[in-house]
Swiss-Prot record:
Gene Ontology molecular function terms on file: tryptophan synthase activity
Cofactor(s) recorded in Swiss-Prot or TrEMBL: pyridoxal 5'-phosphate
Organism: Rhodopseudomonas palustris (strain BisB5)
Domain of life: Bacteria
Primary role: The beta subunit is responsible for the synthesis of L-tryptophan from indole and L-serine.
Enzyme Commission code(s) on record: 4.2.1.20
N6-(pyridoxal phosphate)lysine modification, residue list: K98
UniProt keyword Amino-acid biosynthesis, yes or no: yes
Protein name: Tryptophan synthase beta chain
Length: 404
């Protein structure tokens, strides 16, 4: 907090992809020409009104945007404090926020003449979104997925295969998201001529954190319009779960310069912060992974430690570099929720709202359960319901001993 605060929290990154000391592009020499080619192509697409018009058309007619801003009336009554709204990204085509970003990247890949798309996935939602868009546009799709995640996210594995994607289980490391990303990067280095790497979160080398944020920003832009229309003012607080952090960044970014809006990011505390967890801000330190500098779970020798979360989409040992910077300058408050707290919130949402949340946003909902009761009734809180929980039912049932 001894940093000089910027005039705007929305002006980053700089031309080399840095948010303060975070971000950048730490990649193999063979990848640098691709990174620079991607940066140039994205800058050109961003300035092309036809690209934006085409994307907006697909977002409306294919993805189903805008997604609703829903007043969670029974949860609000249950907690007895803040008025709670859900941004219903779970209602998008493919069932999560991931498709917003994938659409943009696949359109960019086509513009660049790439015919083969690779992606990493944890919970499977980014993989499903990538497989979906590749099917729509007739592109080859290969998805890397940790073997552990393949087992606990079988419904999404079947969806990807049904959509024509090749799912490659990864059996190195902890067999989860970090390892899938490692394999995808190896593939990209080997197949630079025809392959586009579609990263699913606001991590990776520049320009990915910026690009994914820009494609996800539609979430917060819609919330801004919807809450002004519904309540006549901006929300008092925003809350979202954070693994890499794309759903959170999509919600947060349009509000970063609104000083009156308090922002909460919720990491996965797993079995507890003194045990196995995936809370990079709470339990990590700055280091370099997957092409960018950010907060990472590392040992004293700088080796990456394995992350754990009941949620396959949150068990990543790092966090997006812009989130790391927003933490350091004090603009976003980072909290964490354990597996047990997320399961309790999952059950509560099912029973009170008739909405089965993904385990990822259930972590954010767990902190709503802590915050909402102590806030006044006129406090407007918006939670990003980033995905639906069909994919998690078998996993939840197993953890609850089959008793919901």
């Amino acid at each position: 907090m001894n940093q000089i605060l910027p005039n705007s929290f929305r002006s980053g990154p700089d031309e080399r992809g840095h948010f303060g000391i975070f971000g950048g592009r730490f990649v193999a020499e063979t990848l640098m020409p691709l990174i620079l080619e991607l940066e140039k192509a994205y800058a050109e697409a961003k300035d092309d009104p036809a690209f934006r018009t085409e994307m907006d058309g697909y977002l409306k007619h294919y993805v189903g945007r805008p997604s609703p801003l829903y007043f969670a009336e029974r949860l609000t009554e249950h907690f007895g404090g803040a008025k709670i709204y859900f941004k219903r990204e779970d209602l998008n085509h493919t069932g999560a926020h991931k498709v917003n970003n994938v659409l943009g990247q696949i359109m960019l890949a086509r513009r660049m003449g790439k015919q083969r798309i690779i992606a990493e996935t944890g919970a499977g939602m980014h993989g499903v979104a990538t497989a979906t868009m590749c099917a729509k546009f007739g592109l080859q799709c290969v998805v890397y997925m940790g073997a552990v995640d393949v087992e606990r996210q079988q419904p999404n594995v079947l969806r990807m295969k049904a959509l024509g994607a090749e799912v490659r289980p990864v059996t190195s490391g902890a067999n989860t998201l970090k390892d899938a990303m490692n394999e995808a990067l190896r593939d990209w280095v080997t197949n630079v001529h025809d392959t586009f790497y579609c990263i699913g979160t606001v991590a990776g080398p520049h320009p990915y954190p910026m690009m994914v944020r820009d494609f996800q920003e539609v979430i917060g832009q819609e919330v801004r319009e919807q809450i002004l229309e519904t309540e006549g003012r901006l929300p008092d607080s925003l809350i979202a779960c954070i693994g890499g952090g794309s759903n959170a960044m999509g919600l947060f970014h349009p509000f970063l310069d609104d000083a009156g809006v308090v922002i909460y990011g919720v990491e996965a505390a797993g079995h507890g912060l003194s045990k196995l967890h995936a809370a990079s801000i709470a339990g990590g330190k700055p280091g370099v992974l997957h092409g960018n500098r950010t907060y990472l779970l590392m040992d004293d020798d700088g080796q990456i430690q394995e992350a754990h979360s009941i949620s396959a989409g949150l068990d990543y040992p790092g966090i997006g570099p812009e989130h790391a910077w927003l933490h350091d300058v004090g603009r976003v408050n980072f909290l964490s929720a354990t597996d047990a707290e997320a399961l309790d919130a999952f059950k509560l949402c099912c029973r009170l709202e008739g909405i089965i949340p993904a385990l990822e946003p259930a972590h954010a909902l767990a902190k709503v359960a802590d915050l909402a009761p102590i806030l006044p009734k006129d406090h407007l809180m918006v939670l990003n319901m980033s995905g639906r929980g069909d994919k998690d039912l078998a996993s939840v049932a197993e953890h609850l001993g089959g008793k919901f």
